[in-house]
Amino acid sequence: MPTEIAPCDRLIVALDVPSVADAEVMIATLGDAVTFYKIGMELTYAGGLGLAERLAADGKQVFMDLKLHDIPNTVERATRQIAKLGVRFLTVHGFSQSMKAALAGAAGSPLELLAVTVMTSYDDADLATAGYAMTVKELVAHRAVQARDIGIHGLILSPEETQLVRPLVGPDMQLVTPGIRPAGSDVGDQKRIMTPALAIAGGADRLVVGRPVTGAADPAAAAEAIVADIATAVALVGKTNRS
């Protein structure tokens, strides 16, 4: 029986900072307001693997956003190394060979894999320039179904696509959405965005938020406000998603 995700566990704060020292300051500033962190490529290359392991050991949930995509053997072996850190999520690009290899690397561990469908900084024009004949929504749907069939645990997708994808993949896949901006926030380099409450109402399970929290005058208060918005949205739609 699926159990409900606590509102605080639905918010994933992106530690998009250039050093472990900067990340540690932000983590201390956020304190108990945040339970789930995302570590991306910049921080990983600056020593973030050790930080991820420490956070996991301290009881925080960690999402390694590395978007693995290489020859299958490399993806499998890299995934196996990440699984040793004790983190919750790892991203892999939504190409069949990469997804299958990552699943092999995660076998026997609690690591959950999230397939990246289409980056939230892309739009239809960007896909056309890259040689894709599909629209964003068509490519997202195609990769979502492929990930479901391969056995991937969840998806990274824009909040604009959750209502399209949920009927295609069923209730058990985690839908994790970047491109989240509280009302009045700067959109930055994102093109497909939504407020936290609307994203939850649209079917997202977890929301990735960076600058609106880490760049706020009071990051802990900003995180708490987003969690409150999430809690309100969850109550309104009566979500009972998995933990």
From Swiss-Prot:
Subunit relationships: Homodimer.
Organism in which the protein naturally occurs: Bradyrhizobium sp. (strain ORS 278)
One GO cellular component term: cytosol
Xref: NCBIfam families: PRK00230.1, pyrF
E.C. number(s) listed in UniProt: 4.1.1.23
Residues forming the catalytic site: K67
GO aspect biological process, one term: 'de novo' UMP biosynthetic process
Role description: Catalyzes the decarboxylation of orotidine 5'-monophosphate (OMP) to uridine 5'-monophosphate (UMP).
Record pathway: Pyrimidine metabolism; UMP biosynthesis via de novo pathway; UMP from orotate: step 2/2
Positions bound to substrate: 16, 38, 65-74, 120, 181, 190, 210-211
Catalytic activity annotation: orotidine 5'-phosphate + H(+) = UMP + CO2
Keyword Metal-binding: no
Protein name per Swiss-Prot or TrEMBL: Orotidine 5'-phosphate decarboxylase
One GO MF term attached to the UniProt entry: orotidine-5'-phosphate decarboxylase activity
Keyword annotations of the record: Decarboxylase, Lyase, Pyrimidine biosynthesis
Listed InterPro entries: Aldolase_TIM (IPR013785), OMPdecase (IPR014732), OMPdecase_AS (IPR018089), OMPdecase_bac (IPR047596), OMPdeCOase_dom (IPR001754), RibuloseP-bd_barrel (IPR011060)
Family that this chain belongs to: Belongs to the OMP decarboxylase family. Type 1 subfamily.
